[in-house]
Amino acid sequence: MGDISDSYSGGTPTAGKTEYYGGDIPFIRSAEVNSDSTELFLTEEGLKNSSAKMVNKGDIIYALYGATSGEVGLARLNGAINQAILDIKPHANYDAQFIMQWLRKSKENIIATYLQGGQGNLSGTIVTSLLIDCPTYVEQKKIGDFFADLDTIITLHQRNISLYTKNSITPSQR
């Protein structure tokens, strides 16, 4: 992975410094790698005075720590990341969607290989050492787009099922 991308993780501003929080910069944490919103926001001062790093919408973001280890998504907003997230920027001729889908598919194997009994943390070194066999860029794009479309269809069906379940009348209501 390190041969086909650049990567970095961020950091967390000092928690006791209220002037670092409540600004306009979304602060993406590991439980939010597949979310289009965040609970916390940083100020410019908080970003500047910490090792938090900015990511761009469309970057691959990969959770390294705890219960969310191995969760992966494409950033849905520009924001800052903490040390529990690795930002992965593919080099030219490598498709972010394809790489993200490969990481998603490989999650169980990565965790089984690198985390003892599912405990512990992944690291940027582990992720960049992963070997990924990439087809041509055109094929990567087709594969990545196919799985993105499939994810969209699944999400839409899940929403429909939720709406149907929520709005259905139970036999006791008849």
Put a short name on every predicted segment:
Residues 1-11, 36:
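Non-catalytic DNA-recognition/assembly elements of restriction-modification systems
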Residues 15, 79-86, 116-141:
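A short glycine-rich beta-alpha junction/loop motif
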Residues 17-33:
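Short beta-strand/loop turn elements enriched in aromatics
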Residues 29-31, 39-104:
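A short beta-sheet element
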Residues 71, 113-116:
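Short amphipathic beta-strand starts and helix->beta connectors
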Residues 108-109:
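Extracytoplasmic/periplasmic mature domains of Sec-exported, cell-envelope-associated bacterial proteins
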Residues 131-174:
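Amphipathic alpha-helical coiled-coil/heptad-repeat segments
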